[in-house]
Amino acid sequence: MEIFADILPLREQIKTWKREGKRIAFIPTMGNLHEGHLTLVRTAREHADIIVASIFVNPMQFNNVDDLTNYPRTIDEDIEKLTSENVDMLFTPTPEVMYPDGLDKQTVVDVPVISTILEGASRPGHFKGVSTVVAKLFNIVQPDVACFGEKDFQQLALIRQMVIDMAMDIDVVGVATVREMDGLAMSSRNNLLTLNERQRSPVLARTMRWISSQMRRGRNDYESLIEDASDQLRAADLQPDEIFIRDARTLQEPTEETTQAVILMAAFLGQVRLIDNLVVELTTAANEEEEEEEEEEK
């Protein structure tokens, strides 16, 4: 695996692969890699000849300086994992490489509406930082396809919209959330949990599945449903931060025409903010099929 910290030599290698007719897949990460990231790599292999990954803890998307400082950095272990997955290239720029004139003078990419609703409302500027760094990385790597996890549902929607709006010739592939055996969505932040917190963390996914089961049974008093779910989290000493039920396509409030909804959840467990989501099919046929599957599992 070739490792580059600067843009120009990386671009030269990319040009060589392009001249050879190679199709390039890109996986941008912030490091501290886990099985979810490696699943992105394996998915990318199905779509391209060359796999390029990046590790960059992007200061522009952090609202809290302490959060940025405490973000886990495990570059040596990350390199070992990517090498074992036969990744062809790793890009590890510094903030000075990505933002040579500083954050204040950096041109930004802002995706309207999506960047300011839901999680964007409580984390102002976060998604602007995400779209800016991803757009810049796309310009540097020039991939044919890019893979992102569906765990960050709003981020995936944001990037897809940016690619459409900016006429970028890139296929954006969403990859299903990878979970621990107890249901917790894999995340780099999970490493910050204490043993006791880790034992309580599956409550987030269980509560989300409970909401889903209620919705599939026809319950649509969403405000009351969210409050009940919040009570379940508090009972396990999780502090609800955000719980939204939205149309999975528009991220707006569900309507009578909504056939696919998404539950978006965030909660604090100690000092760690956990996020998760679950898509819910609301069509009658889908509900009946899922109910039958649940009965078979019993």
Curated annotation (Swiss-Prot):
EC number in record: 6.3.2.1
Binding annotation for (R)-pantoate: 61, 155
Location(s), subcellular: Cytoplasm
Keywords from the UniProt entry: ATP-binding, Cytoplasm, Ligase, Nucleotide-binding, Pantothenate biosynthesis
Pathway it works in: Cofactor biosynthesis; (R)-pantothenate biosynthesis; (R)-pantothenate from (R)-pantoate and beta-alanine: step 1/1
GO CC annotation: cytosol
Signal peptide range in chain numbering: none
Main localization of the protein described in the UniProt heading: cytoplasm
Coiled coil: none
BP GO annotations: pantothenate biosynthetic process
InterPro entries registered for this protein in UniProt: Cyt_trans-like, Pantoate_ligase, Pantoate_ligase_C, Rossmann-like_a/b/a_fold
Top-rank taxon, per record: Bacteria
Additional record remark: The reaction proceeds by a bi uni uni bi ping pong mechanism.
Role played: Catalyzes the condensation of pantoate with beta-alanine in an ATP-dependent reaction via a pantoyl-adenylate intermediate.
Oligomeric and partner information: Homodimer.
Family stated for the protein in its record: Belongs to the pantothenate synthetase family.
Name of the protein this chain belongs to: Pantothenate synthetase
Organism: Aliivibrio salmonicida (strain LFI1238) (Vibrio salmonicida (strain LFI1238))
